[in-house]
Amino acid sequence: MDFIKPTIEYGDVWPLLVVFGVAAVGVLVEGFVPRAQRYLVQAALAIAGVVVALVGTILVARDLDVLGDGAARGAIDVEGTIAVDGPALFIWGMLLVFALGGALLFAERRLEGGVSAFAGQAAALPGTEAERQASTRGLEHTEVYPLMMFALGGMMLFAAANDLLTLFVALEVLSLPLYLLSGLARRRRLLSQEAALKYFMLGAFSSGFFLYGAALVYGFSGSMGFAEINEAVRDDVGNQTLLLIGIGMLSVGLLFKVGAVPFHSWTPDVYQGAPTAVTAFMAAGTKIAAFGAMLRLFYVAFGSDRWSWQPMLWIIAILTMLVGALIAIVQTDMKRMLAYSSVAHTGFLLTGVLGVQQASELADGEVTSLQAVLFYLVTYGFAVVGAFAVVTLVRDAGGEAGQFVRWRGIGRRSPLVAGVFAFFLLSMAGIPLTAGFVGKWAVFTVALAAGAWPVVIAAVLCSIIAVFFYVRVILLMFFEDDDVSAQGEVASVTKPSVLTSATIFVGVAATLVLGVVPGPVLDLAANAGQFVR
């Protein structure tokens, strides 16, 4: 039996290889670089790797081949397993930009008095002498940087995967590092470890559903490739029961990653317990990668059987928006409130997925569902990373002050920080002149054009509900008095280094610019074209 050498188009996938290469080098750094120098080496390596990969993504995007009638640009590479097309590269760019912000937050040390926000010795039991000694000596886990890079590489591969097997491998590559990172908080170790365990257990459960669904779809179509699956669906060559159950089980795995109801229960616990830098990276990156994979799977592999999965998404989108918006109202912790806000935003994004897919079905100047969802992900990513960066600044003697009562009067003591946080919240609420307003307008418009008006009505109502809990926090910061009775000390705002400051500044600038001048990014999403098939 002859072995056939696989063909790898290095010129197309080298940004992805850079990310994985930096992750591998980061592992070697842990073994060969002295502990005292690891922080600088690992942080510089991760930031440089992300920047190089981002530049590479731009260069690859400039040279994409135009296919067919010009609606799609790109190629199917690596023996048909990876689609390097316009949407994939747009998503890669988003992931790398937000990963750069995440890396800067990972590298922040001023807020914790000269050490990072990560545990000094992860293997030490909370409250033991070993943990106290690790804290006293100022130890920290620099392995978080290669873990972040492995997760980033998995996210990029997840969004570009062109067959079910590659999609599953990418899912595991992005998930496993995040499970570890969620349990490495320096403060509130038990809460962090609980979050990591819940995330791992539920994530493993959802991965099992995904893998079983892939097996059923393979049984239906005889192929793992998206194009071949679509041909089998169009020609109705197999058992429809296998197909429908397979679509449902694949959807479980994807809906878990985006935090959609009823697979959202991990979101508030993990967002609250994980180090806030990890939460920021995960909140933006995981949602972007998972929606990229979902769009490609539903539009390319199951595009010929739209009415088999669309009614399911109608129901899930409405439930997700309602549950996220209503439960966020009763939260008393900032990170849990942002977690349920994230659930509601997942519902808004699912509304966009239900929209019109082909530009030929729309009038000139209207956006497709792919363009609308991509733009929404950009606006949400900048707002959520910036918001969590601000959360790291509000602190008391126990570390970050997440309880609402500790945020009372922050607007009078630190008006700039409170104003920036309020601006991010207003963008998430979809207030005009912010990026969030344009993002919601885009996804609601495409869903309405596709006839999903019940979902749009529910989305508008949930947006109104969401304004309540966002404005509630703003009123808390600016118009309520400090409360020190029975609640301990009032939280203060810690001055960050240039790393966190830069992340917040870019988030504010992008949110403002995209709200006032959204055209260039909408055009960029339109120029990305459709998925290659």
UniProtKB/Swiss-Prot annotation:
List GO terms (cellular component aspect). plasma membrane
Biological process according to GO: ATP synthesis coupled electron transport
Provide the E.C. number(s) assigned to this enzyme: 7.1.1.-
Query: Has the keyword Cell membrane been applied to this entry?
Result: yes
Q: Which GO terms describe its molecular function?
A: NADH dehydrogenase (ubiquinone) activity; NADH:ubiquinone reductase (non-electrogenic) activity; quinone binding
Family annotation (InterPro entries):
NADH-Q_OxRdtase_suN/2 (IPR010096), ND/Mrp_TM (IPR001750)
Disulfide feature: none
User: Which keywords appear in this protein's UniProt record, sorted alphabetically?
Assistant: Cell membrane, Membrane, NAD, Quinone, Translocase, Transmembrane, Transmembrane helix, Transport
According to UniProt, the reaction catalysed is: a quinone + NADH + 5 H(+)(in) = a quinol + NAD(+) + 4 H(+)(out)
Q: List where in the cell it is found.
A: Cell membrane
What is the membrane topology noted in the UniProt record heading this document? Multi-pass membrane protein
Tell me where on the tree of life, at the top rank, the source sits. Bacteria
Q: Mind telling me which residue stretches traverse the membrane in this protein?
A: 13-33, 40-60, 87-107, 141-161, 164-184, 200-220, 243-263, 275-295, 310-330, 337-357, 373-393, 417-437, 451-471, 502-522
Stated role = NDH-1 shuttles electrons from NADH, via FMN and iron-sulfur (Fe-S) centers, to quinones in the respiratory chain. The immediate electron acceptor for the enzyme in this species is believed to be a menaquinone. Couples the redox reaction to proton translocation (for every two electrons transferred, four hydrogen ions are translocated across the cytoplasmic membrane), and thus conserves the redox energy in a proton gradient.
Q: Which family does it belong to?
A: Belongs to the complex I subunit 2 family.
Subunit field text: NDH-1 is composed of 14 different subunits. Subunits NuoA, H, J, K, L, M, N constitute the membrane sector of the complex.
Protein name as it appears in the record: NADH-quinone oxidoreductase subunit N
Task: Identify the species of origin.
Answer: Nocardioides sp. (strain ATCC BAA-499 / JS614)
